[in-house]
From Swiss-Prot:
In-chain residues carrying the UniProt-annotated modification Phosphoserine: S34, S47
Taxonomic lineage of the native organism: Eukaryota, Metazoa, Chordata, Craniata, Vertebrata
Presence of the UniProt keyword Chloroplast in the record: no
Outcome of swapping K199A: Loss of interaction with NGFR
Molecular function in Gene Ontology: GTPase activator activity; Rho GDP-dissociation inhibitor activity
Source organism of the structure: Homo sapiens (Human)
Modified residues (N6-succinyllysine): K141
One Gene Ontology cellular component: membrane
Gene3D superfamilies in the record: Coagulation Factor XIII, subunit A, domain 1
Protein name: Rho GDP-dissociation inhibitor 1
Amino acid sequence: MAEQEPTAEQLAQIAAENEEDEHSVNYKPPAQKSIQEIQELDKDDESLRKYKEALLGRVAVSADPNVPNVVVTGLTLVCSSAPGPLELDLTGDLESFKKQSFVLKEGVEYRIKISFRVNREIVSGMKYIQHTYRKGVKIDKTDYMVGSYGPRAEEYEFLTPVEEAPKGMLARGSYSIKSRFTDDDKTDHLSWEWNLTIKKDWKD
């Protein structure tokens, strides 16, 4: 049986319903301080110095200035029932993702994992923003608060809450997703586009 494509009216209705779920928060970020400034504050207070060291680690602030402060390295769809890994290497050719598509079985539970590094300074209020399109119509916008992170050698990983893939005949098909990793200063650390195909089964 041929898949039934959603009409423009149905897509508009989905977009309107998702628009109602979006919430805006009046939040004013605090003034940004560098790692060096934080380390210099109350440096004669031994207990505070130890606390900051535990919080920030032994940070080397003389990192290569030519390397971006935040480097987003990968996106993974975490799904226990997937037959194989669903991963994007975000350090390579981002344009190639427009020609590929993840296959996700309808109705399964999954999470999105973003892997990233912070190289020099603390970054406040990082966010992962995702716009989802179907047949050129934006049907969903989701903002995930990632939080504030300081520099370290190891990668950080952020996991979104568990979500359920859409299901049903109208939900099956291709989706285009525009992703952006930003922060309180509205710095665009990385923007990329990728595709998702909802199918009745993993290998439909």
